A protein has these predicted regions:
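Flexible mid-to-C-terminal extensions adjoining Fe-S/redox cofactors in radical SAM and related proteins
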Residues: 172-222
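Core AdoMet radical
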Residues: 1-24, 28-67, 83
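Short secondary-structure boundary/capping segments
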Residues: 28-30, 157, 204
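C-terminal accessory regions of radical SAM enzymes
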Residues: 148-182
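A structural signal for short, well-ordered beta-strand segments and their strand-loop junctions
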Residues: 11, 39-41, 81-85, 118-121, ...
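Radical SAM enzyme [4Fe-4S]-AdoMet core and its adjacent flexible, acidic
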Residues: 46-160
C-alpha cells in the first residue's frame, strides 16, 4: 500500500499457488484496488509438465488462481495487467517468445477460459538452485558458453535493471529480481524502500555478475 503512493507502476512477482493459501486469499483484491501489475510464473500450459517440474497439485491451483484473477478483471481491464512467465525446464534457451505466447493464449483460453496480457519467455539465470543443478550435473561451463554465444547487445536498453527497482521482503533495494536472489544490493547511499519516500534513487552504477548474461541472451529476458 505504501509504495504504491510513490511509484508510478508497482509490479509483483508471484508463483500463483501462494494466492490459493487461505491466509493470502484476500491479496488479489488488494492488488486489484491498487492496480498492481502481476507477473505470474506458469512453467507450461500442460498439467503433466507443470506437476513434474513444480510438484503434484501445483497446476490446478495455479489455474484456479488465474481464473479468480480474471474474475477480478485482470487480463480484461486495461489497468489490470497480468503477464505470465515461462522458464525452460533445463539447461537450454527458451523458444521464440511470440510463437509461445500465441500457444499459451490459445491453450489456456480453450481449456480453462483464461486470458492474460503477455508471456515472458525468460532464460534460466545461472543462480540459486539452477546454478546448483548446473554444477551438480557438470553443465555450468557449457551453459555459460551458450549464453555467451547468444549475447545480443540490442537487449541492453530494455533490461529491467535500467528501468525498475526490485524490493526485497525486508524493504532492501536491488537493481533486478536476479540481484535480489544473489543478495546484491543497489550501489549508493539509498538502500531501503523507506528512503524512496524522501528522494529519488537517481543515477547509480548497476551491479553486475555472470548471471547478467541470462538477460542479454537471444531476445532478452527482462
Amino acid at each position: 500500500k505504501e509504495i504504491s503512493k510513490y511509484a508510478k507502476t508497482v509490479m509483483v512477482r508471484t508463483n500463483l499457488v501462494i494466492l490459493a493459501v487461505p491466509a493470502y486469499r484476500d491479496i488479489p483484491e488488494l492488488y486489484r484496488d491498487l492496480k498492481v501489475q502481476i507477473v505470474a510464473s506458469l512453467p507450461y500450459y500442460n498439467e503433466k509438465v507443470v506437476n513434474k517440474q513444480r510438484g503434484k497439485g501445483v497446476f490446478p491451483k495455479s489455474i484456479e488462481v488465474l481464473q479468480r484473477l480474471n474474475e477480478l478483471g485482470y487480463g480484461k481491464e486495461e489497468d489490470l495487467v497480468i503477464n505470465l512467465v515461462y522458464n525452460p525446464n533445463g539447461a537450454y534457451l527458451p523458444p521464440k517468445q511470440e510463437a509461445l505466447e500465441k500457444t499459451y493464449k490459445k491453450k489456456l483460453f480453450d481449456n480453462f477460459g483464461i486470458v492474460f496480457n503477455n508471456l515472458f519467455a525468460i532464460t534460466n539465470n545461472p543462480i540459486g538452485r539452477f546454478s546448483e543443478f548446473l554444477h551438480r550435473e557438470d553443465l555450468y561451463a557449457d551453459y555459460m558458453n551458450k549464453l555467451f554465444r547468444a549475447y545480443n547487445p540490442a537487449t541492453l536498453p530494455g533490461l529491467m535493471c535500467r528501468n525498475m527497482i526490485s524490493i526485497g521482503p525486508d524493504g532492501s533495494l536491488y537493481d533486478c529480481d536476479f540481484n535480489l536472489i544473489e543478495k546484491l544490493n543497489v550501489s549508493g547511499e539509498i538502500q531501503h524502500v523507506s528512503q524512496l519516500t524522501k528522494e529519488h534513487i537517481g543515477v547509480r552504477r548497476i551491479r553486475t555478475g555472470m548471471h547478467c548474461y541470462g538477460c542479454t541472451a537471444g531476445a532478452g529476458s527482462s
